Curated annotation (Swiss-Prot):
Quaternary state and interactors: Heterodimer with CDK4 or CDK6. Predominamt P16 complexes contained CDK6. Interacts with CDK4 (both 'T-172'-phosphorylated and non-phosphorylated forms); the interaction inhibits cyclin D-CDK4 kinase activity. Interacts with ISCO2.
Location in or out of the cell: Cytoplasm; Nucleus
Keyword match Cell cycle: yes
Its job: Acts as a negative regulator of the proliferation of normal cells by interacting strongly with CDK4 and CDK6. This inhibits their ability to interact with cyclins D and to phosphorylate the retinoblastoma protein.
Name of the featured protein: Cyclin-dependent kinase inhibitor 2A
Keyword check for Endoplasmic reticulum: no
Chain positions found as Phosphoserine: 143
Protein family: Belongs to the CDKN2 cyclin-dependent kinase inhibitor family.
Domain of life where this protein originates: Eukaryota
Modifications the protein undergoes after translation, according to the UniProt entry: Phosphorylation seems to increase interaction with CDK4.
Primary site of residence: cytoplasm
Originating species: Rattus norvegicus
Tissue localization of expression: Expressed in spleen, liver and lung. Not detected in kidney, colon, stomach or brain.
Gene: Cdkn2a
């Protein structure tokens, strides 16, 4: 018989919001690892903001890291270009200044994949938090000023 952790992880991975809700309401833990050691938020369908918000509202850990790659859900969302999911994760307390096992920030992954809206959002937040110099030095940007980064004090564009 399949465990509730496996059922919840599978439902989250497939983006089945109603099934995720039913399992959570029935008492399934949003942080219980499945058979493969992954939590629902780690395997969820990244483009499904409703599933992400639902898991987070039931207490899913937005900062859980993969034990092998050290990547977190924000790394996955940034890499795949899911700005809406990234915003929900960040609003739930996900850190944006964490590196994976290869030393990459979520910003690095968004840059590599050309997800410009995600890059703007992350640069804006990191500059607001005073983390731009650390990020810009690593990428050899011209300077750490918002003007140089093209932010000019503007919030990220909304979809």
């Amino acid at each position: 018989m399949e465990s509730s952790a496996d059922r919840l992880a599978r439902a989250a991975a497939l983006g089945r919001e109603h099934e995720v809700r039913a399992l959570l309401e029935a008492g399934a833990s949003p942080n219980a690892p499945n058979t493969f050691g992954r939590t629902p938020i780690q395997v969820m369908m990244m483009g499904n903001v409703k599933v992400a918000a639902l898991l987070l509202s039931y207490g899913a850990d937005s900062n859980c890291e993969d034990p092998t790659t050290l990547s977190r859900p924000v790394h996955d969302a940034a890499r795949e270009g899911f700005l809406d999911t990234l915003v929900v994760l960040h609003q739930a307390g996900a850190r944006l200044d964490v590196r994976d096992a290869w030393g990459r920030l979520p910003l690095d992954l968004a840059l590599e994949r050309g997800h410009h809206d995600v890059v703007r959002y992350l640069r804006y937040l990191l500059s607001s938090a005073g983390n731009v110099s650390r990020v810009t030095d690593r990428h050899n940007f011209c300077s750490s000023t918002p003007r140089c980064l093209g932010l000019r004090g503007q919030p990220p564009k909304q979809r």
